[in-house]
């Protein structure tokens, strides 16, 4: 198109001269120029599409920091403030965290361990996986009744290495999650295992399993949920990004959704703020590569 040719070369030749050569009017060229979206406007529109695609990929869970991180991971050069502005203009808002609820019962006669972990939660990029695990239990409402979820989380990468679901809060629920973690990760002796003082974690069977793996047992102080803040934070994420928007009729419906959330979304796709917006699986892989050790293989 002649107008487009003039636009491409207007820095080299006078507009009037090019209009005469191409037999178009100067007023016609400038009218065309006003009707053509600027490069900035075209970029804005493309970014709007990309931002919405990432937001929808997250099922409406991501706020602007994680949308920005995902766009950068895809090779998009864009500032966080621009992403936040575009999301605001499009009415896209991430889900906000609510206060979490205590589920385990610490009223029992089993012995409890001291708080060895002592809130040392910081992620160390030079660290080694499977040095510290945190365990906890939450409950999930369905129309059929409660479904309970127990998890074991690796503190180095925030990866959920073991989990179990059941209809009761018996010790076997926590034991099944721990067994999964052990089979998947094969931790070395000296693993530090932290939990609250719930009866499931203080029980003889659970403690025997830890002792058999030569693990060091650590427990939160009585009534202090902040001593197990990483596990509590994971459950707050589950609640805000999954549970609060669902109305499951059966426990089996909830089981399927929770499995997908933990294994597919949280471990492998969700970008974690404390991991510099990498996924737990990505961060875990980097830690193993830095340690020059093979990734653990399940039995």
Task: Give, region by region, the residue ranges found by the protein language model.
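Charged DNA-binding/catalytic regions of mobile-element recombinases
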Residues: 1-299
């Amino acid at each position: 198109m002649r107008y487009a040719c003039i636009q491409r070369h207007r820095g080299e030749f006078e507009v009037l001269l090019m209009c005469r050569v191409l037999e178009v009017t100067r007023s016609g060229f400038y009218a065309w120029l006003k009707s053509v979206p600027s490069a900035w406007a075209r970029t804005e529109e493309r970014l709007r599409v990309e931002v919405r695609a990432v937001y929808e990929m997250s099922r409406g869970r991501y706020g602007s920091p994680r949308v920005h991180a995902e766009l950068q991971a895809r090779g998009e050069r864009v500032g966080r403030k621009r992403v936040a502005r575009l999301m605001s203009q499009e009415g896209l808002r991430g889900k906000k965290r609510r206060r979490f609820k205590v589920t385990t019962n610490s009223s029992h006669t089993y012995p409890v361990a001291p708080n060895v972990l002592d809130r040392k939660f910081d992620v160390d990029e030079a660290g080694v996986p499977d040095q510290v695990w945190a365990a906890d239990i939450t409950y999930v409402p369905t129309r059929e009744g409660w479904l309970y979820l127990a998890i074991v989380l690796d503190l180095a990468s925030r990866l959920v290495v073991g989990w179990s679901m059941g209809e009761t809060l018996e010790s076997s629920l926590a034991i099944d999650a721990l067994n999964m973690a052990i089979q998947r990760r094969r931790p070395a002796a000296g693993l530090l295992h932290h939990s609250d003082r719930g009866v499931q974690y203080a029980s003889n069977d659970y403690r025997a399993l830890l002792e058999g793996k030569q693990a060091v047992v650590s427990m939160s102080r009585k009534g202090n949920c902040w001593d197990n803040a990483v596990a509590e934070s994971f459950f707050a994420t589950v609640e805000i990004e999954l549970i609060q928007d669902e109305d499951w009729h059966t426990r089996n419906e909830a089981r399927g959704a929770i499995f997908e959330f933990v294994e597919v979304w949280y471990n492998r796709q969700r970008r974690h703020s404390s991991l510099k917006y990498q996924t737990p699986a990505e961060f875990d892989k980097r830690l193993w590569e830095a340690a020059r050790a093979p990734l653990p293989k399940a039995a």
